[in-house]
Amino acid sequence: MSGVRRLSRLLSTRRLALAKAWPAVLQTGTRGFHFTVDGNKRASAKVSDSISAQYPVVDHEFDAVVVGAGGAGLRAAFGLSEAGFNTACVTKLFPTRSHTVAAQGGINAALGNMEEDNWRWHFYDTVKGSDWLGDQDAIHYMTEQAPAAVVELENYGMPFSRTEDGKIYQRAFGGQSLKFGKGGQAHRCCCVADRTGHSLLHTLYGRSLRYDTSYFVEYFALDLLMENRECRGVIALCIEDGSIHRIRAKNTVVATGGYGRTYFSCTSAHTSTGDGTAMITRAGLPCQDLEFVQFHPTGIYGAGCLITEGCRGEGGILINSQGERFMERYAPVAKDLASRDVVSRSMTLEIREGRGCGPEKDHVYLQLHHLPPEQLATRLPGISETAMIFAGVDVTKEPIPVLPTVHYNMGGIPTNYKGQVLRHVNGQDQIVPGLYACGEAACASVHGANRLGANSLWDLVVFGRACALSIEESCRPGDKVPPIKPNAGEESVMNLDKLRFADGSIRTSELRLSMQKSMQNHAAVFRVGSVLQEGCGKISKLYGDLKHLKTFDRGMVWNTDLVETLELQNLMLCALQTIYGAEARKESRGAHAREDYKARIDEYDYSKPIQGQQKKPFEEHWRKHTLSYVDVSTGKVTLEYRPVIDKTLNEADCATVPPAIRSY
């Protein structure tokens, strides 16, 4: 013990000597740490039993609350705090565990570092990639803002990969072209090797520490607090201690990510459960285009782990059992860098026609071993590691077995390009006061029927920032927060109590697996009416089985059984809208490929001159957005439709891209 005391005294003496040697500015103590995670301990918080004596509620008041702390949520939250708004951020995960961390490939922006480029060419590629279901005003906004967004990230300290002369390195990615599709392959994708999402999320998280945002970490958002058709905050469950919190705010931003876990095989984290999408549904508001689910061409066979499109951007090729580079037959110009929906369908056809690989002939190969080992080591280090761990493959010597895997949800909460959530009434869009959405949870719609690779990370940053700017334009810090009823959130607490004591016959895990396998079997890469109809029936039945659930943990402290059951409820609402929307859409467009309706059905036949053609009525064509609603008590799905926005923000500066036959 005496030795320990002597060592302690010695270290203290050295620290004192070092402190005296520091400049005076550094002797004022540690840097202020603004990442406030004890949101429930704020002096302004008030406890009441206005809902139930069994579930006391802690009430909070903020100028704005952001739900979700991935790339979009963080950018919205610190953007609001930077503008002076008293901001809360509610997240069921610590921010750096959000699924943004898993993105690999990069961020598209027309910087022109590898060759001449123009954001208008990027605009054209994105409209074409969307199969003309994207709203061109939002696409205009996003592509024009992209270069500035990348520069902003660089200024925040994001360590982009570099060219030899020090510029941000840009790789080729699918569906990207020069000169409006006539100038060959574009190199537009800015990256940090193959760990771009990881770098982006940590960069934004680091930036967020500069601002006084109150983070409610490991709080599960249950529902929106709606009064008089406007949003006034959220109600959330503190997972750590089981307390209920009502966070009242003048503005609410939903940034909860996608719902990939409705499917059995997907690249999404197990926490991608469509929580925000489901909250919108329970609030009686519509979701948009949920039938458009992207299957990434290269998930590791058997594991579903993502292998970035950046592999093909660096020169990787897809081959079948005959060693043929088969994409040359399906996309003669773009080949392996065609858009994701085209590549996934081509792979599926190769397997169907008997040219699959392996003993079961049920996958294809991604070949990288023809590339220089130093290129693999510097540009694709994470992929080399992932392939070894999950496929047992040394990418310098053998190909990776891959299969299309659910990766992204193009649909979500309908918004305009400012991030304001929309409802559609009597043929007109109406803004829902106080409610915003961004990231994969939202549908602006910049991706339409198919998202181009490397267009999502930039979507997070641009529209997270747009939400903050929009709130800053319409409100001031300290504006009066509208009141809520004393029992606001009562239904959410009743539902939580019901699930906590659920004593049926079906485990949450069993019902979730049945839903995931049904979605995988009935709404996959290729779809057909009879199978979709069967799937609608199965998912509806499974939704009804929610009332037969059995939970086992009756406590309130770290009750993960309860949280997973709440997530299952959310997934079911997303699954219902996805499969009913797919069954109703009698055409093939982007990621929605119907074998019984193989043509894209527009208002005109764009394979021919439109002069002399009669425009189809709105109800007779499918170039329109699906709006879906669910009666939560019965599971009945109702569908409506709203027109696609073709006008840009400034036709003189960026002309509308008219629909055309889409080929690569």
From Swiss-Prot:
Gene3D superfamilies cross-referenced by the UniProt entry: FAD/NAD(P)-binding domain (3.50.50.60), Fumarate reductase/succinate dehydrogenase flavoprotein-like, C-terminal domain (1.20.58.100), succinate dehydrogenase protein domain (4.10.80.40), Succinate dehydrogenase/fumarate reductase flavoprotein, catalytic domain (3.90.700.10)
Keywords, sorted A to Z: Acetylation, Electron transport, FAD, Flavoprotein, Membrane, Mitochondrion, Mitochondrion inner membrane, Oxidoreductase, Phosphoprotein, Transit peptide, Transport, Tricarboxylic acid cycle, Tumor suppressor
PTM statement from Swiss-Prot or TrEMBL: Phosphorylation at Tyr-215 is important for efficient electron transfer in complex II and the prevention of ROS generation.
Activity regulation information from UniProt: Enol-oxaloacetate inhibits the succinate dehydrogenase activity.
Active-site residues, Swiss-Prot/TrEMBL: 340 (proton acceptor)
Any one GO MF annotation of this record: flavin adenine dinucleotide binding
Disulfide bonds: none
Catalytic function, reaction form: a ubiquinone + succinate = a ubiquinol + fumarate; a quinone + succinate = fumarate + a quinol; (R)-malate + a quinone = enol-oxaloacetate + a quinol; (S)-malate + a quinone = enol-oxaloacetate + a quinol
Presequence boundaries: 1-42
Modified residues (N6-succinyllysine): 179, 250, 335, 485, 498, 538, 547, 615
Modified residues (Tele-8alpha-FAD histidine): 99
Pfam family, one: Succ_DH_flav_C
EC nos: 1.3.5.1, 1.1.5.-
Cofactor(s) essential for the protein: FAD
Subcellular location: Mitochondrion inner membrane
GO terms classed as biological process: mitochondrial electron transport, succinate to ubiquinone; respiratory electron transport chain; succinate metabolic process; tricarboxylic acid cycle
Enzyme class (EC, first level): oxidoreductase
Role noted for this protein: Flavoprotein (FP) subunit of succinate dehydrogenase (SDH) that is involved in complex II of the mitochondrial electron transport chain and is responsible for transferring electrons from succinate to ubiquinone (coenzyme Q). SDH also oxidizes malate to the non-canonical enol form of oxaloacetate, enol-oxaloacetate. Enol-oxaloacetate, which is a potent inhibitor of the succinate dehydrogenase activity, is further isomerized into keto-oxaloacetate. Can act as a tumor suppressor.
Identification of the protein by name: Succinate dehydrogenase [ubiquinone] flavoprotein subunit, mitochondrial
Species of provenance: Macaca fascicularis (Crab-eating macaque)
